[in-house]
Amino acid sequence: MLTFVGLGLYDERSITIEGRDALANADRVFAEFYTSKLAGATTSDLEAFHDVDIEVRDRVGIERDPEPLFGAARDGSVAVLVAGDPMIATTHVDLRLRATEREIDTRVVHGTTAQTAASSLTGLQNYRFGKATTLPFAYGSGGVPESVLTTVSENRERGLHTLCYLDIEAEREAYMGADDAARRLASAFGEDERFDAGEETLAVAIARAGSPAPTVRADRLSVLSTTDFGDPLHLLVVPGDLHHVEADALEALAGAPEDLISSYRVR
């Protein structure tokens, strides 16, 4: 049996009770933290809290050489730990499909995701989010890929919000900050006629979702780009049209300037 266990968003306590039970019943426990990670816990923290030994696999060990993991799952019960929800990343869907092809039973224990947290913390309605996108580190001289701009533009044309995941390079422990993301988007929007507000576009920065003290700030990209949001992990949301409850929520929960919000309200 191969069980994918979502760890939730922040630390060793973010897992569900069902997830803890899966760990307690596993013969071996693996983990990967290159698609995402828990900002508030180390592998040692997880091992101590859950009283298990964790074998951390890198990208090669998950994507190119998963046979040791499959072999263990054929002989016993294996848990694979993943930050957030296991099946959000294509990597884990692919791993599950390959296990199924080998007639290995699989199971998924869900965890809280960044997408649900983004909606909960900002007050933006979940069903009003369009396609999400990822803003990468490695692109030209620090610019923004056309695919990202197209996603945001097409969502805005439909009045929908865009959740921007920010790049993680686990090998060098690099995590894109919301200020860096806002700076990149402000520059790109300022040069693209699809974004008439340019660097004055409304955005919402979210830092350390799932922690006891997350930060949520709504303002112009130009303002967010010069704001220190502290420790990772960060997200950035570019809102579309705002229902009056969403507009009120951004003002009350994220400190959005009233004069900026007024132009986004649905009349």
Language-model features: locations:
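Class I SAM-dependent methyltransferase SAM-binding "motif I" and its flanking Rossmann-like core
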Residues: 84-161
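Structural motif
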Residues: 1-3, 27-28, 53, 77-80, ...
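Class I S-adenosyl-L-methionine
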Residues: 1-105, 109
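Residue-level signal for pocket-adjacent positions within structured domains
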Residues: 10, 127-130, 219
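A contiguous loop/helix-start segment that scaffolds small-molecule binding in enzyme catalytic cores
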Residues: 156-267
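A short acidic, often aromatic-flanked loop/helix-cap motif at beta-alpha or helix-coil junctions
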Residues: 60-66, 114, 171-172, 210-213
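Short, surface-exposed amphipathic charged segments that create phosphate/polyanion-binding patches used
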Residues: 67-75, 120-125, 143-147, 216-223
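Alpha-helical scaffold segments in soluble metabolic enzymes
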Residues: 45, 68, 72, 98, ...
